[in-house]
Amino acid sequence: MADEQLNEKDLNVEETGAGNAADTRVLELEEQLAAAKDQALRAVADLQNVRRRAEQDVEKAHKFALEKFSSDLLPVIDSLELALAHSSAEDEHVKQIREGVELTLKMFQDTLKRYNLEAVDPHGQPFNPEHHQAMAMQENAEVEPNSVLNVFQKGYLLNGRLLRPAMVVVSKAPSAAQPSINEKA
């Protein structure tokens, strides 16, 4: 009987040892499985990020592909506008030429508008350093300080991105008159 009890104890110890080894192995495998799942999720997330970035790059390429071309056309628009500004509508000798230039400019502007190229003509608006470049400041009591008084050259936006800033004259508040020597005393 004592031998049977010893055998049972040995079997229990062996089973416990084998059970501990199996439990340890199961825990290791569960940890490996969790790590593999985490790695797979990270790989999927990385793939989605790469795909999203590629789509954004393609979208930007389509959206701003005309940027250089549009920049090169802006001096042509400026020249047509300058021709209209310096020609007289009453002069019979240039009336037909002026009408042709007006139509050409209108067609040109309509075409550029179709491709989301917008003019920035800020006359009378508050100065915006993101879209305007101040060429000079001028005292003026009739308008709010930091308002655009004059536009030397229109600016342009392509799909909301600044292509060229508007060159402007900005108002400033009139300076107070310097007191004379007699007023100081």
UniProtKB/Swiss-Prot annotation:
Chief location of this protein within or outside the cell: cytoplasm
UniProt biased composition (Basic and acidic residues): 1-12
GO-annotated cellular components: cytosol
Location of region: Disordered: 1-22
Domain of life: Bacteria
GO biological process: one example: protein folding
Matches recorded under PROSITE patterns: GRPE (PS01071)
Keywords on record: Chaperone, Cytoplasm, Stress response
Classification via InterPro entries: GrpE (IPR000740), GrpE_coiled_coil (IPR013805), GrpE_head (IPR009012)
Localization per record: Cytoplasm
One annotated GO molecular function: adenyl-nucleotide exchange factor activity
A Pfam family per the record: GrpE
Subunit and interaction comment: Homodimer.
PANTHER family reported in the protein's UniProt record: GRPE PROTEIN (PTHR21237), GRPE PROTEIN HOMOLOG, MITOCHONDRIAL (PTHR21237:SF23)
HAMAP family, sorted: GrpE
Family affiliation: Belongs to the GrpE family.
Function, in words: Participates actively in the response to hyperosmotic and heat shock by preventing the aggregation of stress-denatured proteins, in association with DnaK and GrpE. It is the nucleotide exchange factor for DnaK and may function as a thermosensor. Unfolded proteins bind initially to DnaJ; upon interaction with the DnaJ-bound protein, DnaK hydrolyzes its bound ATP, resulting in the formation of a stable complex. GrpE releases ADP from DnaK; ATP binding to DnaK triggers the release of the substrate protein, thus completing the reaction cycle.
Name of this protein: Protein GrpE
